[in-house]
Design a protein with these regions (language model features):
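Long, well-ordered alpha-helical scaffolding segments within enzyme catalytic domains
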Residues: 127-133
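N-terminal accessory segment detector
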Residues: 1-102, 109-127, 138, 142-159, ...
Length: 349
């Protein structure tokens, strides 16, 4: 392996680790809402997250992936196949006709990783489908397009699956997502599945897109939870989730980032690499064993129009949890700020 290949592989490990951390945060946040606020509130939160993502990303994504000239049912299903494949999600696509195309997420489910799936109510999983899949026809300007769900993993079935169907008539709101548990998807043939053009999707672009896929969920979830539950409750839920995930994931993330357990010195070095791996610029100064980290803005949230200072609880919770995973008694403090573009000044130790 050449030096350039070595460096690329190291960068890829770091990006993958950042993706795993943000992926865990998003899944953990849903479970935190389930356990602290109940199923109904969790379902409303998940619905709002996926509806916002659908409204912001579906149509631009169709164009970016070269799917915008396909029939509506086929375009919608292929979008889910390709966009999720980029993020490392297990996904299958099966074409039947121009008016009927299947999408299937076989086990293990990406979003409900590991044992998390045992804590996800069916209503919360359905909210995801209501938020995104049921609204694709509306986005495409074709009110005849609906989604028929035939299986849900969280209900004990062997995957989440269903098909987009273009009916002969416009659908009412409650007809855009229906369930048909007596049906089953046809077999998946990878040889007939759509593929990304290699020229416009080279490996480095795919690697970065893999990282961004997971981070985008947190980018959406943080402002949504503030709008749904208010800044005080949202800050608590984001902070608690961050602490729990940070404590659980420090060793795993540190291994990929070249970090280790220790004291404030080791944790400051770890944070420097973490900032670099998520495209944030940070300057670190040390004085008598204490570190000040000046984070030059938060790139993930820089273009979020409804950013609220409570969103920063994502970082305060994560960093406190990661510090606890690194070693005992490593205090982490963030000086208050009020805008996504303002520098964040952290004190460590």
């Amino acid at each position: 392996m050449t030096g350039e290949q070595d460096a690329r592989e190291t960068q890829w490990r770091k990006w993958r680790s950042v993706a795993d951390l943000y992926h865990a945060f998003f899944t953990g946040l849903i479970l935190t809402v389930v356990t602290r606020r109940g199923t109904a509130d969790a379902a409303e939160f998940v619905f709002r997250v996926f509806r916002r993502q659908q409204q912001e990303r579906f149509l631009p994504g169709l164009k970016k992936l070269g799917l915008d000239s396909l029939p509506p049912a086929v375009a919608a299903a292929q979008y889910h196949y390709l966009s999720n494949w980029i993020g490392g999600v297990h996904v299958e696509y099966m074409y039947e006709t121009d008016r009927k195309a299947w999408i299937r997420y076989p086990p293990p489910r990406w979003i409900w990783k590991g044992t998390a799936i045992c804590g996800v109510p069916g209503e919360v999983s359905r909210a995801m489908l209501r938020g995104w899949h049921a609204n694709n026809g509306v986005a495409l300007g074709d009110l005849r397009l609906g989604f028929v769900c035939t299986k849900q993993s969280v209900d004990g079935q062997d995957g989440l699956e269903g098909y987009y169907c273009e009916y002969d008539h416009p659908l009412e709101l409650d007809q855009r997502l229906v369930f048909a548990r007596h049906l089953e998807a046809p077999p998946f043939d990878p040889n007939t599945a759509p593929a990304l053009p290699v020229d416009s999707w080279p490996k480095p672009r795919l690697e970065k897109a893999y990282r961004n896929y997971a981070m985008e969920y947190v980018k959406t979830a943080a402002p949504v939870i503030v709008q749904v539950f208010g800044p005080e409750d949202a800050s608590y839920l984001l902070h608690l989730t961050g602490r729990l995930i940070g404590m659980q994931y420090y060793d795993e993330v540190a291994q990929a980032l070249g970090g280790r357990r220790g004291r404030a010195t080791e944790f400051a070095a770890f944070l420097r690499t973490l900032f670099e791996s998520q495209d944030d610029i940070a300057d670190i100064t040390e004085s008598e064993g204490q570190f000040e980290i000046r984070q030059q803005g938060w790139k993930l949230m820089a273009d979020v129009a409804d950013y609220h200072p409570a969103c920063a609880s994502v970082l305060t919770g994560l960093f406190e949890g990661l510090a606890a995973g690194c070693g005992r008694r490593i205090p982490v403090h963030l000086k208050p700020n009020s805008a996504a573009g303002a520098p964040f000044v952290w004190s460590i130790g």
